Amino acid sequence: MNNLSKNDFLKLYRNILRCHKILQEPMRSMGDQYVKTEWKLHKKATPKQAIQFYEQWNIYCNILLTQRDSILKENSNNNDNYNNNNNDNNNDNNNFINIGQDLNEKQMKSLNKKQIEQLDKLKSETSTVYTPSDK
């Protein structure tokens, strides 16, 4: 993992943005902007920070890939049913796709004050467009 190149980071960045394509607006653009901002903020990270950054974003990407593939498989299995019963826009805000996962207790305890503030800000921003009742 110590031999990460700029191409590895670029590939991961692109994979994350590709995974975000399954999200409905405004979650997609919010997620894309968050990823872009994080990448810019970590351009001058130390090698140790860069490895941690890559590892955590790689975990996120793998979670998204697994969930995306599951959703795509489910949609392809139900494609005829969906096409026959739904003539509405595919990005209907009432049909949010639940992607991602909550942080566990260990992850929450490992966050520093700035990260907690950033997480709270992200929760606040996303709550304006998505609430648990939308699931």
UniProtKB/Swiss-Prot annotation:
InterPro entries: SDHAF3/Sdh7. Keywords: Chaperone, Mitochondrion, Transit peptide. It is found in: Mitochondrion matrix. It comes from the Eukaryota. GO terms for biological process: mitochondrial respiratory chain complex II assembly; succinate metabolic process. Plays an essential role in the assembly of succinate dehydrogenase (SDH), an enzyme complex (also referred to as respiratory complex II) that is a component of both the tricarboxylic acid (TCA) cycle and the mitochondrial electron transport chain, and which couples the oxidation of succinate to fumarate with the reduction of ubiquinone (coenzyme Q) to ubiquinol. Promotes maturation of the iron-sulfur protein subunit of the SDH catalytic dimer, protecting it from the deleterious effects of oxidants. May act together with SDHAF1. Belongs to the complex I LYR family. SDHAF3 subfamily. This is Succinate dehydrogenase assembly factor 3, mitochondrial. It comes from Dictyostelium discoideum.
